[in-house]
């Protein structure tokens, strides 16, 4: 069945729009890697995260661009990745990135952390009276050796478990002490609703840190 819509909207299938909801979703194979926190802008990853929001596990698959494209290499890694996905809890999302290498030998699969940025960054290439040129450029930043971007560049296939949108309490935000004090000052007069073990909601306020 063919649908003409953005990738995330196609996840209406998870609601039974085209019959019984799927057991799992495979999004991709995308031409070009989706690594690091830049996956926020990926339609391939976005579709997988949307499926997870409906309680359906999903695998997002991307491969480096090459000539020729190494689609068979990516396909060979999809099956074992789906096996891992199906063994995980419902709503799990795995992000698989495949290097542009021949099928034989099959690249080693590594669990990886998300890189701070990604393989490329978006930049403004130029502006004119009625137009704007956007470009993809190298980040120029030293990579974390355990990150998905770094391992992919070394020829490994990478898998990362990711989550969609989640709320974070102010105390849990990864900020400096000064930033957290500023945030607490902003939220000082707002009640925080935290359900306890018994399901009851307790109201509390945020006190300044020393």
Name every feature range the model reports, one short phrase each.
Residues 5-6, 30-33, 101, 164-165:
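Short glycine-rich anion-binding loops that position phosphate/pyrophosphate groups of nucleotides
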Residues 52-74:
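Glycine-rich phosphate/pyrophosphate-binding loops
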Residues 17-22:
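Glycine-rich phosphate-binding loop signature in dinucleotide/nucleotide-binding domains
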Residues 73-210:
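Electrostatically charged, flexible surface regions
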Residues 33-42:
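Glycine/threonine-rich flexible loop motifs
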